[in-house]
Amino acid sequence: TDCGILQRIKVKQQWAQVYSVGESRTDFAIDVFNNFFRTNPDRSLFNRVNGDNVYSPEFKAHMVRVFAGFDILISVLDDKPVLDQALAHYAAFHKQFGTIPFKAFGQTMFQTIAEHIHGADIGAWRACYAEQIVTGITA
């Protein structure tokens, strides 16, 4: 599956469902990170944001930043020049952290989306996340 226009629309629509407003955003982010840490228990990458406690104010602030970034990237999936600039910014920023498990995080996010949305198009998520976001952010 490619990240074509239909897949981008599905991803944007499903993101709007799962990451709607207010407290549900935090709840979704906590679900994603709890699922991620179950299969990727090494939290050393998150030491400076109190990664041992996903409920701490420091880690909640980190989650807000991470998911705000996803929100930006997903909102511009269909605007290639803006998407490319946003990805270049995030790629430059993340270089300071060394190797980041973007693929594993994506798999966890897909699983969590499927838990929150019946009939989620995980193929579209995999394609757009792998082809656009991971490829761009690791460039």
Curated annotation (Swiss-Prot):
Pfam families: Globin. Disulfide bonds join C3-C128. Heme b binds at H94. It is found in: Secreted. GO terms for molecular function: heme binding; iron ion binding; oxygen binding; oxygen carrier activity. Keywords: Disulfide bond, Heme, Iron, Metal-binding, Oxygen transport, Secreted, Transport. GO terms for cellular component: extracellular region; hemoglobin complex. PROSITE patterns: GLOBIN. InterPro entries: Globin (IPR000971), Globin-like_sf (IPR009050), Globin/Proto (IPR012292), Haemoglobin_extracell (IPR014610), Mb-like_M (IPR044399). Residues 2-139 form the Globin domain. The giant hemoglobins of worms are formed of a monomeric subunit and a disulfide-bonded trimer. This subunit is monomeric. Belongs to the globin family. This is Extracellular globin-1. It comes from Tylorrhynchus heterochetus.
